[in-house]
Amino acid sequence: VVIGVDHGVPIPVLRAFDGRGPITLVHIDAHIDWRDEVNGVHEGYSSPIRRASELSHIDRIFQIGMRGQGSARAKEVEDALNYGAEIITAYEVHEKGIDSVLDRIPANENYYLTIDADGLDPTVMPAVAAPVAGGLLFYQVRGLIHSLAQKGRLLGMDIVEITPERDLNGISSLTAGQLILNFIGATARAGYFS
């Protein structure tokens, strides 16, 4: 489990999994994060999924919770789709349920889960720089974690982009902590540590 500041954090973490592939990357976020660079920075908060797509051991990418207006330029969306990334909006999750998303993710694979806090709804994760209404709910992300741990091997998880000074009543810290505990519990129940 990695807890980080900006969404550039998963880039070196994913590189460290070289040799453990193929890996299916599951990305929860309001934004697609396929920018090549922002102000000359190629490995920052808007680029982790593009960088992941360049790693030979990352086999598939599922992007869940997308809904941020203006978060991607046409070229970035085109690049993501050309790579084969499956972009699943938060609205689709709400309308069809998290199980319909899980049905699209192949079983018996290695998974890495990267969570940008703004992928969750601001009612459960308010302490973010770019809040967008309509995000995933705690129970949906919890269900995703438990299902991935059961259907394959959940190699790791990160949660990033929490802005502590915006954390109303500690709600975001509590939600992040509960997700981390669910990751640990789900992997233990799946027999990872026996």
Model-derived regions, located:
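Conserved alpha-helical scaffold segments that buttress catalytic/binding sites
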Residues: 1-194
